[in-house]
């Protein structure tokens, strides 16, 4: 009988030990989870200097190219070097403005040309060229607004389950339908990426196109994910040395899809919350 009582007492003690150990482990796990959450909430990034390549990408459809515009780079006198309906080759001079040569980026046909000795303003369409081939059209209004006039643009494309990645032969401004009231005008905010005639594609194929401009060096950059806002201006949460959280307005420049250029509002070394103000449940 005494032996039975001892066995029961021993079992009770062992059960109590296991129960306390389990509670301790659960408590430790909960504490670690709280610590991880606190650490995650306190994540920050610093404003750094670096390089960034302005980039825009989208998925679109291959279509026959439409005529594109060649514009005057400045105010001045335009003199033509070609005739209407003339067949031209890539790199051929089509005219000059104040002595500056205007060249066609591709082979094509001149379908419209301004008269010689004509005074033209900057950005005035002086010629329309028809390229016989395929193209990809990209809505790039926001992208273009961050770039200087006549920025050098390059593009590559990848056909879905097909050819690529392949260089585009030119990035141009497509012409809108001309009429007696509007004259020659570009399609606003649209870039037309021309595909070489030697590349085997067909109309209607889906493709991803990536357009890039000249890389900018030694600029202030932050990850896109920390900013509320994407175009022109945005908001970030600056963490001061004493831990104060300050909602700060910033002026934004070009982006490569992952990072964005900071034009004003922050300085190199500033510490910013990794959570943008509009997504931070704690507020400011």
Feature roles, as predicted:
Residues 19-22:
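C-terminal motif of bacterial Sec signal peptides marking the signal peptidase cleavage site
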Residues 24-28, 152-160, 185-186, 193-284:
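Edge-of-domain interaction segments
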Residues 28-36, 63, 175-189, 241-242, ...:
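Gly/Ser-enriched beta-turn/beta-hairpin loop segments
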Residues 30, 34-77, 92, 274:
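N-terminal beta-strand block that forms a small beta-sandwich/beta-barrel module immediately after a flexible targeting
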Residues 40-41, 45, 107-111, 134, ...:
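Beta-strand/loop subdomains of soluble extracytoplasmic proteins
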Residues 53-63, 68-75, 100-107, 137-139, ...:
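Small beta-strand-rich domains/subdomains or short beta-sheet motifs embedded
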Residues 62, 67, 84-105, 115-141, ...:
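Short hydrophobic beta/alpha edge segments that flank linear recognition/processing sites
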Residues 73-93, 111-125, 194, 259-265:
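Short histidine-centered loop motifs in beta-beta connectors
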